Structure formats: structure tokens, C-alpha cells
Amino acid sequence: MIPFTNFESRLIKLPINNVDTDQIIPARFLKTTSKVGLDKQLFNDWRQDPDFVLNRPESQGLQILLAGDNFGCGSSREHAPWALTQWGFRAVISTSFADIFKQNSLKNSLLPIEVPADVHAELFSSDGPAKIDLPNQTLTTPSGREVHFEVDQFSKHCLVKGVDELGYILEQAPEIAAYEASHPAPINALA
């Protein structure tokens, strides 16, 4: 995983509510366990339209997806955040996310940011870049408005350090070894 740094990017706007995981990446592309190449299947059915937002040259290299309400609903599939991160997205902004999509995203270096409806509307009506500061949990809108967002401390730590759950445990190896050395295993008298 790549450490999550503060960044600034214009927004790719997808003003569609209730985008489910099958629309993010259709089920026919879920046979792989590799993340490589999933960006080509991201929003595959919609990308058949040459005017779809991801097909526009000005969308290339942008790192923030501004999505409609209830983004990532539907079935649990880790391929959805994989495809989004393979495209280059570091964050998705919406008023709400499906819980399982939110958890899958946090475990795969994609920051889901929930904002109030008024901020959401402001972002859809603005054109400049937004700034994301994960350590301070702030989103700065193109107009300069600073908005606090929530993220649990464990996920925040993992994103900032660029580690997954196993990486986090491995970071604690010296402390675990010290604890085990100072607490000998009990003798099993029944053996």
C-alpha cells in the first residue's frame, strides 16, 4: 500500500445516486484476484458511451471522484475499490456510502469521505481543485471552505502509514516480542 499524503485535485463528477458495485465493476470481471488492469473495467458498461465522464481527456490523472448519494451500494466486492484505485482515485466524496463498500475502500487505500448535502451541492457546482488533508481530517472545497470529515483512527493510521491490517501487526512486532518475553507461556499440566 502507498502512504496516503495530503493532495489537491480537481473532481471527476458522477452525479448519479445509488451507484452499486455492479455498476462500478460488472460481475463478469470478478474472476481475477489480481488488481492489475481493473481500471479498464471501471464503470465498464457506462464507458461504452464516448461522452462518459471517465472518457474525457480532462478526467485523466484526477484523483477525487465526486459521487451521488449512497455510493457503493449492492453486493460486497473488493474489486470495486481495487478498480477505483487502479484508475488513480485516492478518495471518493459522497453524502453516504454502503457500509461494506466503505470498509472495503479503507482496507484498500481508498478514502471515502462523507459530506453534508450542502457541501456536496457546492462541490458539484464548483470547478476548481479540492484539497484533502487526512491527518487533520479536512476537505477544503474549491471556494476555500474547510470541512471536517470522520474516519476511524485505525483506518486513518493504516492509510497514512501505507499499511494494511497485517502490516500494522508487523509494525508492532518488537512490542509483541517484548510482551511475550516478559510473560512466559503457562505450562500445560494436562499434556
From Swiss-Prot:
Which GO molecular function annotation, any one, does this entry have? 3-isopropylmalate dehydratase activity
Give the enzyme's EC designation. Answer: 4.2.1.33
GO BP: any one term = L-leucine biosynthetic process
Superkingdom, natural source: Bacteria
- GO cellular-component term (any): 3-isopropylmalate dehydratase complex
Any idea which UniProt keywords this protein has? Answer: Amino-acid biosynthesis, Branched-chain amino acid biosynthesis, Leucine biosynthesis, Lyase
Q: Does the keyword Lyase apply?
A: yes
Q: In which pathway does it act?
A: Amino-acid biosynthesis; L-leucine biosynthesis; L-leucine from 3-methyl-2-oxobutanoate: step 2/4
Report the InterPro entries cross-referenced here. Answer: 3-IsopropMal_deHydase_ssu, Aconitase/3IPM_dehydase_swvl, AconitaseA/IPMdHydase_ssu_swvl, IPMI_Swivel, LeuD
Q: Which catalysed reactions does the entry list for this protein?
A: (2R,3S)-3-isopropylmalate = (2S)-2-isopropylmalate
Pfam families, per the entry: Aconitase_C (PF00694)
Q: Where are the transmembrane segments?
A: none
Q: What family does the entry list? A: Belongs to the LeuD family. LeuD type 1 subfamily.
User: Any idea what job this protein has?
Assistant: Catalyzes the isomerization between 2-isopropylmalate and 3-isopropylmalate, via the formation of 2-isopropylmaleate.
Q: Which NCBIfam families match?
A: leuD (TIGR00171), PRK01641.1 (NF002458)
Assembly and interaction partners: Heterodimer of LeuC and LeuD.
Protein name from the UniProt record: 3-isopropylmalate dehydratase small subunit
Q: Which organism is it from?
A: Solibacter usitatus (strain Ellin6076)
State which gene encodes it: leuD
